[in-house]
Amino acid sequence: MVKVPVVRVNEKAILPHYATFQAAGMDLAACLDEPVTLAPFSTALIPTGLAIELPPGYEAQLRPRSGLALKHMISLPNAPATIDADYRGEVMVILVNYGKTPFIVCHGDRIAQMVVARYEHVRLEEVKALSETDRGDGGFGHTGV
């Protein structure tokens, strides 16, 4: 298991945890001094009170929580958001309210999931043409909706 150092940049921060044994993502909690109200169709930057040190070759992906999306239309507009291995600042979550009613975020609310994943850098090689496939350039629903 990969170890990821974490620092509470706010003493009230809640450490992320996996809700179940095989969960892919850890729940991230809001670290707030006072509640934040998300008006319909508005965004807010929500602090977690945590900073992490990912090893080289890893990223943290921030993703919406399905229950918040289903029940309240709360999501992350840039999902999945990426935390790079060389970032050392506080992990912040951009929330958006796609719903019709205000949504209140309180300290300790689980607001997102964090999935730590490996990645590889690639070297792009410019060529004159790409190899042909049966699919070709078909995309955006070309196989049906």
Swiss-Prot record:
Enzyme Commission identifier(s): 3.6.1.23
Residues engaged in binding substrate: R65, S66, G67, N78, T82, I83, D84, M92
Gene Ontology biological process terms from the UniProt entry: dUMP biosynthetic process; dUTP catabolic process
InterPro entries: dUTPase, dUTPase-like, dUTPase-like_sf, dUTPase_trimeric
Family membership noted in the UniProt record: Belongs to the dUTPase family.
Domain of life per record: Bacteria
Cofactor(s) annotated in UniProt: Mg(2+)
Protein name (database record): Deoxyuridine 5'-triphosphate nucleotidohydrolase
Keyword Metal-binding set for record: yes
Leading EC class: hydrolase
Catalysis performed (reactions): dUTP + H2O = dUMP + diphosphate + H(+)
